[in-house]
């Protein structure tokens, strides 16, 4: 029988529900259980694919092509699993599906209501996420906070699950903020008490509290919370601020969180062996070197827009025994005149993805600087496309070369719209999304990075591609197409082999990086940056 764990939040948003859920998932996985995890987002968008990065952060893409919340990146990195489209559910997605069924007459003339139709659809998504992955345990995080009007159908569905599958198969975990008032010199439990009161008013009694705090919590405070919130004192778990996120699973295990969960759900499984994870954390906490990477982007005011890129760089840093120091460079501010000032101290340059014209000329200048000064450079998605544009302009003499996306009237459309995208009008959910194969060129930098594999599978999110009309011109000038689709139609990786490291990929390698298993192309880039730093000393 599948076990269901529901994680809700109270008092304030952004208190780390996703990290708590992911950490618990890692602990349960290390007990030998097959775990999956999903995120409920109560916004009305179908998915975050068309949302501004300034509002939502990055869009995380799954193997099967779902555009999802960035928390799924945390889930995959912590638990080391590949999630699917059932792992992110929004209000918009649920209402869209219910209304589509209503139009088809599938409700046989019934009045369509929040209860039972919306709540039934939500419960079906929970169960589908578990069955499609054949999981022993599914953890469902509900975005937002208890008391938000848009969360009510989600919480009602969670309440109903207890009756549907039995109380011994359901556990409710409530995460809240425990504020510390410096003036009074004490922690305040009242916000948590009111949050739990609100949750109980909706028919959900939490079985565990996870309290986010900056200071250590005395047992007396935990006892008070247990008494007023009707949970066992040992089920009041402290989630204190840490230096590194990957410490959190170990901190939760030290408080027997996973054992309490297993006892409640009647799971008789071995203790979690966190030896490898602990060794990884020790390595992270004791890095001996620092490597400086310039990240040139258009959304740098909100680092969450590049969350997976940053994490992948860190993972590859761990493998090289180096911390990554990021210089956040706003592409809008970068010009040929100030490129040396902004980029001259970097050991490596990364140009990540994006959409639209703003900032593209600055990114092109960053790529040009990397090429002309032989600074290790990694381009991702739009960064790969602009790598091709830069080469066309400044090496091949195609002065007005551009992407069709950025200039439909360009005489040299180095990057063109994909053929199967030409007649598509909708923006949402219509990109080339998900896992696709990439055939590697033997002897190339890319092939070496991937241990000379012939084919790798990586996740994509794009609508434009390299225009093959220009392929011979590029190759004649020494530009290498080191990764292509198996049918040789789509360019996936480009490089200049004579440089220290000058590689760009159409796909998003960062989406498959893990703290204990860094993505190979990122690792090759960071390794080159470390070597470049050493040569400059």
Swiss-Prot record:
Gene Ontology molecular function: ATP binding; CTP synthase activity; glutaminase activity; identical protein binding; metal ion binding
Residues where ATP binds: 14-19, 71, 240-242
Residues annotated to bind Mg(2+): 71, 141
Lineage: Bacteria, Bacillati, Bacillota, Bacilli, Lactobacillales
Quaternary structure (record): Homotetramer.
Source organism per UniProt: Streptococcus equi subsp. equi (strain 4047)
A Pfam family reported for this protein in Swiss-Prot or TrEMBL: CTP_synth_N
CDD domains recorded: CTPS_N, GATase1_CTP_Synthase
Binding-site residues for CTP, renumbered to this chain: 13, 148-150, 188-193, 224
Annotated UTP binding sites: 13, 188-193, 224
Cellular compartments per GO CC: cytosol
Coiled-coil ranges from the UniProt annotation: none
Name of the protein: CTP synthase
Keywords: ATP-binding, Glutamine amidotransferase, Ligase, Magnesium, Metal-binding, Nucleotide-binding, Pyrimidine biosynthesis
Function of the molecule: Catalyzes the ATP-dependent amination of UTP to CTP with either L-glutamine or ammonia as the source of nitrogen. Regulates intracellular CTP levels through interactions with the four ribonucleotide triphosphates.
Residue span of region Amidoligase domain: 1-267
């Amino acid at each position: 029988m599948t076990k269901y764990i529901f994680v809700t939040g109270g008092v304030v948003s952004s208190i780390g529900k996703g990290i708590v859920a992911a950490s618990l998932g890692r602990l349960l996985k290390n007990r030998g259980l097959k775990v999956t995890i999903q995120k409920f987002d109560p916004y009305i968008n179908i998915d975050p694919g068309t949302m501004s990065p300034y509002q939502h952060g990055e869009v995380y893409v799954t193997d099967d092509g779902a555009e999802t919340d960035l928390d799924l990146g945390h889930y995959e990195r912590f638990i080391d699993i590949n999630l699917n489209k059932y792992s992110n559910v929004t209000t918009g997605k649920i209402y869209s599906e219910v209304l589509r069924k209503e139009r088809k007459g599938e409700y046989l003339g019934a009045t369509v209501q929040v209860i039972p139709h919306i709540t039934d659809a939500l419960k079906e998504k929970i169960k589908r996420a578990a069955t499609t992955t054949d999981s022993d345990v599914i953890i469902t995080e509900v975005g937002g906070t208890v008391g938000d009007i848009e969360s009510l159908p989600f919480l009602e569905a969670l309440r109903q699950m207890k009756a549907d599958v039995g109380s011994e198969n359901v556990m409710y975990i409530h995460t809240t903020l425990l504020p510390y008032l410096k003036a009074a010199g004490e922690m305040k439990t009242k916000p948590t008490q009111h949050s739990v009161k609100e949750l109980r008013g909706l028919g959900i009694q939490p079985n565990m509290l996870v309290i986010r705090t900056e200071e250590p919590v005395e047992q007396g405070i935990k006892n008070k919370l247990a008494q007023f919130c009707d949970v066992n004192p040992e089920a009041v778990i402290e989630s204190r601020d840490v230096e590194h996120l990957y410490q959190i699973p170990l901190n939760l295990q030290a408080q027997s969180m996973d054992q309490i969960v297993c006892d409640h759900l009647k799971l008789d499984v071995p203790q979690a062996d966190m030896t490898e994870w602990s060794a990884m954390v020790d390595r992270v906490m004791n890095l001996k070197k620092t490597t400086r990477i310039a990240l040139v982007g258009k959304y740098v005011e909100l680092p969450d827009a590049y969350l997976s890129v940053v994490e992948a760089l860190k993972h590859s840093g761990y493998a090289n025994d180096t911390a990554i120091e990021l210089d956040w460079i706003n592409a809008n501010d970068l010009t040929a005149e100030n490129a040396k000032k902004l980029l001259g101290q970097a050991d490596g340059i990364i140009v990540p993805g994006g959409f639209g014209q703003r900032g593209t000329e600055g990114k092109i200048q960053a790529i040009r600087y990397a090429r002309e000064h032989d600074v290790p450079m990694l381009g991702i998605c739009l960064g790969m496309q602009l790598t091709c544009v830069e080469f066309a302009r400044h090496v091949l003499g195609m002065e007005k070369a551009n992407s069709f996306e950025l200039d439909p009237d360009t005489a040299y459309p180095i990057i063109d719209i994909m053929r199967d995208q030409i007649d598509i009008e909708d923006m949402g959910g219509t990109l080339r999304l998900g896992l696709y194969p990439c055939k590697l060129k033997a002897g190339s930098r890319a092939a070496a990075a991937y241990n000379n594999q012939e084919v790798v599978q990586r996740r994509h999110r794009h609508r434009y591609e390299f225009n093959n009309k220009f392929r011979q011109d590029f190759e004649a000038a020494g530009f290498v197409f080191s990764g292509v689709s198996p049918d040789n139609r789509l360019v996936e990786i480009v490089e200049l082999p004579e440089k220290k490291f000058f590689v760009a990929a159409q796909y998003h390698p960062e989406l498959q990086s893990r703290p204990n298993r860094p993505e190979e192309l990122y690792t090759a880039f960071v390794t080159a940056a470390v070597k470049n730093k050493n040569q400059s000393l």
